[in-house]
């Protein structure tokens, strides 16, 4: 299943760093990422394996609806966000700080 390398590098937008994501990383070996809205689970799995060099056990996705916010008199709406919870295979470890430092050196 040959996926486009360029597409895979664009699928993952950013890691999500929150209290919940830190607990998941420590207890369940899961990483949380913000991904493109039209990204599929196989694409997300392939992208994480390509970019970080780790084995992925499974991917769970959830689309969070954007909140309605007021801007003065007008009502605006924040964008919907798709999150991917990526479970790493047993024995695999992903250090985002080290991965970011390695990417900066290239």
From Swiss-Prot:
SUPFAM superfamilies in UniProt: Ribosomal proteins S24e, L23 and L15e
A GO cellular component annotation in the UniProt record: ribosome
Keywords: Ribonucleoprotein, Ribosomal protein, RNA-binding, rRNA-binding
GO biological process, one term: translation
Alphabetical list of InterPro entries matching this protein: Nucleotide-bd_a/b_plait_sf, Ribosomal_uL23-like, Ribosomal_uL23/eL15/eS24_sf
NCBIfam families in UniProt: PRK05738.1-3, PRK05738.2-4
Protein family according to the UniProt entry: Belongs to the universal ribosomal protein uL23 family.
Role: One of the early assembly proteins it binds 23S rRNA. One of the proteins that surrounds the polypeptide exit tunnel on the outside of the ribosome. Forms the main docking site for trigger factor binding to the ribosome.
Name of the molecule in the record: Large ribosomal subunit protein uL23
Species of the source: Neisseria meningitidis serogroup A / serotype 4A (strain DSM 15465 / Z2491)
Species lineage: Bacteria, Pseudomonadati, Pseudomonadota, Betaproteobacteria, Neisseriales
Originating gene: rplW
């Amino acid at each position: 299943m040959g996926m486009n390398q360029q597409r895979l590098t664009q699928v993952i937008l950013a890691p999500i760093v929150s209290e919940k994501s830190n607990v998941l990383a420590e207890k369940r070996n899961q990483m949380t990422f913000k991904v493109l809205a039209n990204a599929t689970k196989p694409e997300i799995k392939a992208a994480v394996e390509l970019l970080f060099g780790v084995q992925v056990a499974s991917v769970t996705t959830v689309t969070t609806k954007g909140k309605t916010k007021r801007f003065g008199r007008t009502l605006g709406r924040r964008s919907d966000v798709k999150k991917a919870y990526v479970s790493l295979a047993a024995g695999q470890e992903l250090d985002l700080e080290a991965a970011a430092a390695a990417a900066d050196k290239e």
